[in-house]
């Protein structure tokens, strides 16, 4: 206090975040999954959005754990999503980075479904209640399920097997402005044109 006199001291902290429950065969530092997962968890720091979501859904104090139990959430779907999020992709500077990370902090109380939807949209997935559990469907590359062609399509009376319609060109977006918290700029909000 003698160094600063009567000046107001400003403090900044660089926090890693919470210790979460992650799969027992997962190494968060290397982002590697070894062997077959037995469905058990271990505590570790992770910024993988799938395990941040698991924490939010099952934690009884600040999450939805008082309403949802671990058996009510499809951990196997989150495991596959977590692996996809951890895949290395080019970072644009000659290196690689994980495909999707989560460095969020929640500061206001909101409806649970809104927070759940926001978490899911960050990793390109949707929450789905299948009648027994809360599961997740992610938009990611996968094998084709069915090929449609003239031999397996019912023809209408006019003989045209397919009718195509598209949105107007003026209604299609080809760029979007994204706001994000930039750790390289003092954690200030930055806008990026993508």
State what each model feature region is.
Residues 1-123, 130, 181, 186-188:
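Polar, S/T/G-rich
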Residues 3-6, 103, 137-194:
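Surface-exposed, non-catalytic interaction/assembly patches
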Residues 132-135:
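Hydrophobic residues embedded in beta-strands of well-ordered beta-sheets
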């Amino acid at each position: 206090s003698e160094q600063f006199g009567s000046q107001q001291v400003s403090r900044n902290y660089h926090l890693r975040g919470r210790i979460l429950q992650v799969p027992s065969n997962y190494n968060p530092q290397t982002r590697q999954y070894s062997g077959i997962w037995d469905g058990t968890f271990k505590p570790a720091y992770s910024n993988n959005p799938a395990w941040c979501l698991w924490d939010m859904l099952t934690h009884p104090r600040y999450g939805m754990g008082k309403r949802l139990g671990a058996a009510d959430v499809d951990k196997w779907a989150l495991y596959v999503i977590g692996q996809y999020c951890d895949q290395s992709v080019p970072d644009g500077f000659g290196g690689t980075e994980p495909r999707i990370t989560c460095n969020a902090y929640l500061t206001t109380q909101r409806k649970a479904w809104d927070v759940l939807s926001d978490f899911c949209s960050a990793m390109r997935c949707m929450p789905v209640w299948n009648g027994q559990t809360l599961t997740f469907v992610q938009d990611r590359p996968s094998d084709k399920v069915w090929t449609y062609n003239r031999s397996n399509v019912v023809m209408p009376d006019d003989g045209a097997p397919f009718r195509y319609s598209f949105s107007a060109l003026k209604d299609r977006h080809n760029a979007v402005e994204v706001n994000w918290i930039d750790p390289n700029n003092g954690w200030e909000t930055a806008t990026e044109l993508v």
